[in-house]
Amino acid sequence: MRIFKTNVLLRFVNSYIIDSPQPANLSYLWNFGSLLALCLIIQILTGCFLAMHYIPNVDLAFDSIEHIMRDVDNGYILRYTHANVASFFFIFIYVHIGRGLWYGSYRAPRVLLWSIGVIILVLMMAIGFLGYVLPFGQMSLWGATVITNLLSAIPIFGQDIVELIWGGFSVSNATLNRFFSLHYILPFVLAALAVAHMIALHTHGSSNPNGLTSNGDRYAMYPYFIFKDLVTIFAFFLVLSIIVFFYPNLMGHSDNYIPANPMVTPSSIVPEWYLLPFYAILRSIPNKLLGVLAMFGSLLILLIMPFVDFSRTRGNKTLNPINMVFFTIFVCNFITLGLVGANHATEPFIFLGQVCTTIYFAYFFVIVPVTSILQNTFLDIATIINKSA
């Protein structure tokens, strides 16, 4: 193992993966970082192989996907693995963010770590949207048309920006070429951000369920936490294999198996499932510009968490029953937003979406600051009582 400490490149690997000291009390919720790294590697590899056979042309894109499925050796495995790992990627990052919110991992000194993570989430959504357009089925075409048209809400320059993205006056060959180029290159930018995320993590070390910084009770990453990560990695491969080989279209949309036809509008136009909560927020506001701002704001609002949580304690929210109740409501509300986004924009889903959107933003702007101030007040009262006793 001496080479890991003397070689310039391997010393970096040793510092971050092998000898990195980790808190002894990390639970399995801390395993999602390694699962996300694995998903990114799988996506880049399968994406590179798929790009060898894909043709970014409006007349040939759909047929090239069918060629991959039917004629390329194990092409169907490549395509279904790429599509389903994308879904798992978002499942894992939502749990990863939820864990950060639950345990206060966004608190100083890890503000930079949290901020990079939010940027990664936004970039992932952009990459996912670009990839959804590439098969050029019905949902791809109309999804691209609707989502890119949102930019027309920008005053004065909106329509010009939309036409610049399209490369014309509608989704066309130029659009598909641009989306393919960006979908190919942006995952490498995502990988660079993931490395920056790791560097920021290594600077102050990983958080832990108690929220306490302790340099004494730590173990090396290898072998303890490496083998712990392998448990969830093997479980992930088991579930992924079952879905890829038995239920490959479980998280897909049937309309995307119909070639794109600009003359026929699908009965419902919905994005991929992992974008549905934010799509519901967009639809819940009648004004187009305000809806677009709310949708992007619902992502970027995560950046303010380190500044609106005034609590003097950190760690598990079970230490504060009030926070625990409101966080549970927030999670249920987020899931409800996803269900609302999957349904048509009719009553009662319009009203339900507006209520859920209000709760979503209220959690960050009202609930977190108020509950943290209440917690500090109760702690001060308890301290005064203990001193006077």
Curated annotation (Swiss-Prot):
GO biological process: mitochondrial electron transport, ubiquinol to cytochrome c
Residues engaged in binding heme b b566: 96, 197
Keyword Transport: yes
Family matches, as Pfam families: Cytochrom_B_C, Cytochrome_B
Binding, a ubiquinone: 202
Recorded superkingdom: Eukaryota
PROSITE patterns linked: CYTB_CTER, CYTB_NTER
UniProt-annotated binding residues for heme b b562: 82, 183
Gene Ontology MF terms in the entry: metal ion binding; ubiquinol-cytochrome-c reductase activity
Membrane topology: Multi-pass membrane protein
Any single Gene Ontology cellular-component annotation: mitochondrial inner membrane
Intracellular or extracellular location(s): Mitochondrion inner membrane
Cofactor note: Binds 2 heme b groups non-covalently.
Cofactor(s) annotated in UniProt: heme b
InterPro entries hit by this protein: Cyt_b/b6_C, Cyt_b/b6_C_sf, Cyt_b/b6_N, Cytb/b6-like_sf, Cytochrome_b, Cytochrome_b_C_euk/bac, Cytochrome_b_N_euk/bac, Di-haem_cyt_TM
Membrane-spanning parts: 32-52, 76-98, 113-133, 179-199, 225-245, 289-309, 322-342, 349-369
Task performed by this protein: Component of the ubiquinol-cytochrome c reductase complex (complex III or cytochrome b-c1 complex) that is part of the mitochondrial respiratory chain. The b-c1 complex mediates electron transfer from ubiquinol to cytochrome c. Contributes to the generation of a proton gradient across the mitochondrial membrane that is then used for ATP synthesis.
Family per similarity comment: Belongs to the cytochrome b family.
Misc note: Heme 1 (or BL or b562) is low-potential and absorbs at about 562 nm, and heme 2 (or BH or b566) is high-potential and absorbs at about 566 nm.
Name of the protein in its database record: Cytochrome b
Organism encoding this protein: Mycena viridimarginata
Gene: COB
